[in-house]
From Swiss-Prot:
A motif ('HIGH' region) lies at residues 42-52. Belongs to the class-I aminoacyl-tRNA synthetase family. Its EC number is 6.1.1.4. This is Leucine--tRNA ligase. NCBIfam families: leuS_bact. It is found in: Cytoplasm. A motif ('KMSKS' region) lies at residues 619-623. GO terms for cellular component: cytosol. GO terms for molecular function: aminoacyl-tRNA deacylase activity; ATP binding; leucine-tRNA ligase activity. Keywords: Aminoacyl-tRNA synthetase, ATP-binding, Cytoplasm, Ligase, Nucleotide-binding, Protein biosynthesis. The gene is leuS.
Amino acid sequence: MQEQYRPEEIESKVQLHWDEKRTFEVTEDESKEKYYCLSMLPYPSGRLHMGHVRNYTIGDVIARYQRMLGKNVLQPIGWDAFGLPAEGAAVKNNTAPAPWTYDNIAYMKNQLKMLGFGYDWSRELATCTPEYYRWEQKFFTELYKKGLVYKKTSAVNWCPNDQTVLANEQVIDGCCWRCDTKVERKEIPQWFIKITAYADELLNNLDKLDHWPDTVKTMQRNWIGRSEGVEITFNVNDYDNTLTVYTTRPDTFMGCTYLAVAAGHPLAQKAAENNPELAAFIDECRNTKVAEAEMATMEKKGVDTGFKAVHPLTGEEIPVWAANFVLMEYGTGAVMAVPGHDQRDYEFASKYGLNIKPVILAADGSEPDLSQQALTEKGVLFNSGEFNGLDHEAAFNAIADKLTAMGVGERKVNYRLRDWGVSRQRYWGAPIPMVTLEDGTVMPTPDDQLPVILPEDVVMDGITSPIKADPEWAKTTVNGMPALRETDTFDTFMESSWYYARYTCPEYKEGMLDSKAANYWLPVDIYIGGIEHAIMHLLYFRFFHKLMRDAGMVNSDEPAKQLLCQGMVLADAFYYVGENGERNWVSPVDAIVERDEKGRIVKAKDAAGHELVYTGMSKMSKSKNNGIDPQVMVERYGADTVRLFMMFASPADMTLEWQESGVEGANRFLKRVWKLVYEHTAKGDVAALNVDALTEDQKALRRDVHKTIAKVTDDIGRRQTFNTAIAAIMELMNKLAKAPTDGEQDRALMQEALLAVIRMLNPFTPHICFTLWQELKGEGDIDNAPWPVADEKAMVEDSTLVVVQVNGKVRAKITVPVDATEEQVRERAGQEHLVAKYLDGVTVRKVIYVPGKLLNLVVG
């Protein structure tokens, strides 16, 4: 073998071998235990970033380890290929989204291969191909027939100048990103899937997911937001309809002093006919996009509609206000306000001088002080007529029962979760397979017209979707009648909700899934991806699995047994202030830094001499120009080094700080491994290891080898603390580098140790391990080698350290066999120079012996 470690030579050779041998292609095999290891599929943006590399390295380490345990391991990869960025890039580069996407896929596929990930490439899929999305379209038509799909109007961002719908990220400070026109909210008909029909199951099954992070489960619980309460109906004077509100606190009902409705509510619209101030307020609300996160912090505003509602229990008239914090799409578009016991209602009532009536006593039994804020804690009722003196639970039930008996209340379970709106007014997505006949009938596209293919050879004007701009595209005939196709496309979360199942049978032509293959591989054993997907993707992913189960395609309830959310990758960020006061971010690669004795950055400048401001470590991002290109690092150090650093620098679920000095350290370690194998093999053949003939030192070294195997196995397999596994291998390597290699058994032991080290490193650094395994004459390819097993006998401590004291003072530490008698220990202690010195010419009056630990000789 060559003396120097040259990753650029060995890595491409090993990758070619895997390709030619199709090493990682698998098929169902009932005789083997399966393991399905899946990383979230990438969006083909053009280049891999370090976040991808971290995600996929973790997955590859787990997959290769499970393979070495003898399991049938599926690790597939594909491309989440539809989406808005392709439209922007196509306009910018004067091309169409399809060629841009396919070029990116080809480029990124090479990057994945360059990193040595062991994927089954025969299962690769791209979600933008009709072969993939046809089954999603077919499934959608079946959900429609089951009553799980419906159409209703819903608000979108509308640019009146371009006459087009904008995604949230295309609205900048309330204006269109392209023409800067003020964006309006417009109601348009859209398709929805009834995820709410599965709300209870999605919530309850979270308890089955023992190996999902609690943070993700909590986020999903809160997102689904199940609550129990009462729906209450109010009569409104001079208004044709009643108003219905939902409350989780009926115990506070006697303190309800006003109602609030959304600006879009029919009551507000009616009142606005003769109220210009209200009409202007409704207009203002229509054009503010309100995300829930902003709701909490934005200024609460409202206008009195002039209508009065009648409190069903007191008969009092209470005002009805239109307010910007009530949304039509949530619940009934109306809420009851109890300003004494709800902080938002309190602030609104204080601002507009509305009545605040306390009905709950403070914890000490006194009347609450409402001069500064509402009392939101639960407590005992007062000021509430017949309900005075009841505690929260008793009052909840008594008031709910009374309202129900009067016919104006009903107990209800409510969810925060809303149905999934899957319509997008974009081009680069799967066409929604619905048609409208001439007579207005809406129906699913007939099976013989599926898939509805998205034309790829299009011209993008950057404004209107090509399939909306071309009136001919939508024309079709159904049952001999002219019909128009739906020109909206699916939300791209649709494709990523079921791809994991299609990987089990990517070539299947008879339907969405081949149940036999799907049920062999599913559920996924471990799913790896970022925590940012906790509610959207990971909820739709679970929902789709249940839909496929209820369609008879899969027989499990949940799609993935374990979820691992990898931490973000951080890097140093630097900027200098330009002439106009703007920040110019400089890549850490281009920063020349000075550090103090603790390694902290104290000064930095760039090649042009700008003094740089160092802002610390932050997430790698385009905006701060602090992304590190994985390709550059692989070309500089090799894929194995990059992979090793990624797994060693921090626990998988914590943030990782990119430090090139750490990468250099990983590289030095691999060079040491190479050097040790080189020096060992240069001495020629090795004799068989005879464990019965080993010296104490050799036994101790062998004990370290097998203890390391046991620790690494536990760290990777059970604890998934990959960084501590690598640290243990490094520690063993340090001992091996110092071990004697002269004797026959020294070299036999070194051979056993190196074969173990190479196999333990294999999941992390597969190229160098593949090569060194061959140099060590390991059996077959390392890809088919079994994981090393710790020898229990070798780990038994057959000697122990005994502390020897004379009159309570430590004079020596001696190594003795575990089964040595007290006499043997005394004899051995007497051979120590220092002990003998203190025993010379004196009488031993007493011996205190703690077996295997301590020998104290009391002399006088």
